Amino acid sequence: MRSATIKRKTKETDIEVAVNLDGTGVVNIATGIGFFDHMLDLLARHSRIDMTVKAVGDLHIDFHHTTEDVGIALGQAVRQALGDMAGITRYASIHMPMDETLTRVVIDVSGRPMLVFRTTFPRDKIGEFDTELVREWFNAFAMNAGITLHVETLYGENAHHIAESCFKGLARALRSALAIDPRNQGEVPSTKGQLGG
């Protein structure tokens, strides 16, 4: 089973994350940030990754540390659960609609971290959640999962819909890219014979 648990404690946050890449999208999320919990719930359910996220952070300051540190821990958990990445599909691309919004997400599970994030929001906040934290989370996740990730919102007007299309797009791209391709017969999908080097 491709699964991992990560515990990460700093002076700012105390986080425990568990993932099962071969799950059915079972979710247990509690970060203390309602909108962020909603986005992580979407990520788990649409990727079919079983996901537990427990986070206690310095929310009296703002949501930045908790959001970023959850991205770090989730990325580390996915990377650990992947092991040597043998048999994975590796690449995926999705166009994700959310009402008037359309976002393209392209992923390469390469072991080489990179984020290209071309998404803007029409306002600074969704409820109490700073929209700039969407990019912060995606960056933390991509860097620690070791994936190349391109996120581009082609058009959209509603900030909630834009954020949701980004998270759902990532979910469906992960679902495809992390899937085991039986034609790979357990081989690492790289001419180098390994990923990440």
UniProtKB/Swiss-Prot annotation:
Q: Which reaction does it catalyse?
A: D-erythro-1-(imidazol-4-yl)glycerol 3-phosphate = 3-(imidazol-4-yl)-2-oxopropyl phosphate + H2O
Q: What is its EC number?
A: 4.2.1.19
* Top-rank EC class of the record's enzyme: lyase
Q: Name one GO biological process term.
A: L-histidine biosynthetic process
Q: Name one GO molecular function term.
A: imidazoleglycerol-phosphate dehydratase activity
What cellular component GO annotations does this protein have? cytoplasm
What metabolic or biological pathway is this protein involved in?
Amino-acid biosynthesis; L-histidine biosynthesis; L-histidine from 5-phospho-alpha-D-ribose 1-diphosphate: step 6/9
Query: What keywords were assigned to this record?
Result: Amino-acid biosynthesis, Cytoplasm, Histidine biosynthesis, Lyase
* Family annotation (InterPro entries): IGPD_sf, ImidazoleglycerolP_deHydtase, ImidazoleglycerP_deHydtase_CS, Ribosomal_Su5_D2-typ_SF
Chief place where the protein resides: cytoplasm
Compartment(s)? Cytoplasm
Domain of life, per lineage: Bacteria
Disulfide bridge map? none
Q: Which PANTHER family match?
A: IMIDAZOLEGLYCEROL-PHOSPHATE DEHYDRATASE, IMIDAZOLEGLYCEROL-PHOSPHATE DEHYDRATASE HIS7
Q: Which NCBIfam families match?
A: PRK00951.1-5, PRK00951.2-1, PRK00951.2-4
Q: Family per UniProt? A: Belongs to the imidazoleglycerol-phosphate dehydratase family.
Q: What is this protein called?
A: Imidazoleglycerol-phosphate dehydratase
**UniProt source species:** Bradyrhizobium sp. (strain BTAi1 / ATCC BAA-1182)
